[in-house]
Amino acid sequence: MSITKDQIIEAVSAMSVMDVVELISAMEEKFGVSAAAAVAVAAGPAEAAEEKTEFDVILKAAGANKVAVIKAVRGATGLGLKEAKDLVESAPAALKEGVSKDDAEALKKSLEEAGAEVEVK
């Protein structure tokens, strides 16, 4: 007859703290693992799962309709005609940095409708 999981849990819950520590050490030696490493690995992915809140909008290329893209850049950034033209011609260039996801997506959509190639990072 084999021991069930419930029987093991009952036996461990009846042990003193020192006995549990010794049991853990014995299990680490027997199976060649470390309980501390398992805890650290389990905590790692949770930090990586944090959602990004600030995005950068990068103009990668102006496309065929450069005039429409310049107008869209002027409207989105408030730059003058010359500054917007210089920015579009120097692509790839950052249009806006540290904006919300909704603002970044809206800007990307308006620029792509004008014919530009845009990336949100």
Swiss-Prot record:
Q: Does the keyword Endoplasmic reticulum apply?
A: no
Taxonomically, the superkingdom here is: Bacteria
GO cellular component labels: cytosolic large ribosomal subunit
- Keywords in alphabetical order, please: Acetylation, Ribonucleoprotein, Ribosomal protein
GO biological process: one example: translation
Q: Which residues carry this modification: N-acetylserine?
A: S2
Question: What does the entry report about post-translational modification of this chain?
Answer: Acetylation of Ser-2 converts L12 to L7.
Give the Gene Ontology MF terms in alphabetical order: mRNA binding; structural constituent of ribosome
The keyword Ribonucleoprotein belongs to this UniProt entry's keyword annotation? yes
InterPro entries noted in UniProt: Ribosomal_bL12, Ribosomal_bL12_C, Ribosomal_bL12_C/ClpS-like, Ribosomal_bL12_oligo, Ribosomal_bL12_oligo_N_sf
SUPFAM superfamilies membership: ClpS-like (SSF54736), Ribosomal protein L7/12, oligomerisation (N-terminal) domain (SSF48300)
The protein's role, per its UniProt record: Forms part of the ribosomal stalk which helps the ribosome interact with GTP-bound translation factors. Is thus essential for accurate translation.
| Assigned protein family | Belongs to the bacterial ribosomal protein bL12 family.
- HAMAP family in alphabetical order: Ribosomal_bL12
Give the quaternary structure: Homodimer. Part of the ribosomal stalk of the 50S ribosomal subunit. Forms a multimeric L10(L12)X complex, where L10 forms an elongated spine to which 2 to 4 L12 dimers bind in a sequential fashion. Binds GTP-bound translation factors.
From the Swiss-Prot or TrEMBL record, give the protein name.
Answer: Large ribosomal subunit protein bL12
